[in-house]
Amino acid sequence: DEVLVNNCFSNFKPEVVVHSAASYKDPEDWEEDSKTNVLGSIHVARAAKINGVCRLINFQTALCYGRPQQLPIPLTHPTAPFTSYGITKTAGEQFMLLSGIPTLTLRIANVTGPRLAIGPIPTFYKRLKTGQNCFCSDTSRDFLDMSDFLSFMDIAIKLDKPTGTFN
């Protein structure tokens, strides 16, 4: 809701904005992914620019790389998303950059920890608990523990910290 976003920014006047909203529920619901991940990012970027925000922290996804050609994935790796989520999060990242506000983009995957109900670990847990089989493809996954993630965020929100894109 663009009006709500603008009102929040104009009333609160943040210096730093952490943009982590995302739609990732139904891979076939391209419209919802677009509304949340693209239009939502546009609303945040515009409101940030209008209201003098000094720094944006944007959560992207490692799915922006599609099927990586090499591991670990270097920042020079081309983006080639092939899912609605990956495509729309990548478009959202571009709108954050278009704002001209110094932006830290984090292309992370699989944050795990207490009360997180999405991702491979909760999925495996639910399947095993109900007696279903689990399957693993020939792939590699990165995992980031929530406590490490929060420690990093304490550092990242400081105005004098680096900007740019990081895996």
In which residue ranges do the predicted regions lie?
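Conserved Rossmann-fold NAD(P)-dependent oxidoreductase catalytic core, especially the SDR/UDP-sugar
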Residues: 19, 42-84, 104
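Short alpha-helical oligomerization interface
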Residues: 26-40, 74-81
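NAD(P)H-binding glycine-rich loop region in Rossmannoid oxidoreductase-like domains
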Residues: 1-36
